[in-house]
Swiss-Prot record:
Residue positions where N6-acetyllysine is found in the record: 38, 45, 58
Matching InterPro entries: NA-bd_OB-fold, Ribosomal_uS17, Ribosomal_uS17_arc/euk, Ribosomal_uS17_CS, Ribosomal_uS17_N
Oligomeric and partner information: Component of the small ribosomal subunit. Part of the small subunit (SSU) processome, composed of more than 70 proteins and the RNA chaperone small nucleolar RNA (snoRNA) U3.
Record-annotated disulphide pairs: none
Cellular localisation: Cytoplasm; Nucleus, Nucleolus
Naturally occurring in which organism (per UniProt): Canis lupus familiaris
Key words of the record: Acetylation, Citrullination, Cytoplasm, Lipoprotein, Methylation, Nucleus, Palmitate, Phosphoprotein, Ribonucleoprotein, Ribosomal protein, RNA-binding, rRNA-binding
Pfam families for this protein: Ribosomal_S17, Ribosomal_S17_N
CDD domains tied to this protein: Ribosomal_uS17 (cd00364)
Post-translational modification Phosphoserine, affected residues: 67, 110
N-acetylalanine modifications at: 2
Family label: Belongs to the universal ribosomal protein uS17 family.
Name of the protein described by the UniProt record: Small ribosomal subunit protein uS17
One term of GO molecular function: rRNA binding
Length: 158
């Protein structure tokens, strides 16, 4: 528990009461605090790290105060330079009526990445769900990570 206290404010889950009276029971070593987590539904499993981990993230869909509603999208991870936020790229085709053909287009999205997803790298495919606005540019949360299969450069349509 001491390793997560790196911020100036005390890090704790707001739904867990930590000040249980231990005078009558006697101090029996360091007990592990209970952890709040939830099943977000929609067929997504709660990661093992969210249940057993010690991180505190109020914007996590599994352990925080964020509900997933609205759109479910997928994209490819392109940048990981922010703290707990990644940039994903969504490719799509746009029809040009004059030439009766399609052109490639893409959009970049900033997405909140919970600490329960540890092994995420550039090129992985992530499934994201819409939530309330978490910051100026972040409106989606990572729900599932799929490892990149091959290193073949190609246009991927989601």
């Amino acid at each position: 528990m001491a390793d997560i206290q790196t911020e100036r404010a005390y890090q704790k889950q707001p739904t867990i009461f930590q000040n249980k009276k231990r005078v009558l029971l006697g101090e029996t070593g360091k007990e592990k605090l209970p952890r709040y987590y939830k099943n977000i539904g929609l067929g997504f499993k709660t990661p093992k790290e969210a249940i057993e981990g010690t991180y505190i993230d109020k914007k996590c869909p599994f352990t925080g105060n964020v509900s997933i509603r609205g759109r479910i999208l997928s994209g490819v991870v392109t940048k990981m330079k922010m703290q707990r936020t990644i940039v994903i790229r969504r490719d799509y085709l746009h029809y040009i009526r004059k030439y009766n053909r399609f052109e490639k287009r893409h959009k970049n999205m900033s997405v909140h990445l919970s600490p329960c997803f540890r092994d995420v790298h550039i090129g992985d495919i992530v499934t994201v769900g819409e939530c309330r606005p978490l910051s100026k540019t972040v409106r989606f949360n990572v729900l599932k990570v799929t490892k990149a299969a091959g290193t073949k450069k190609q246009f991927q349509k989601f």
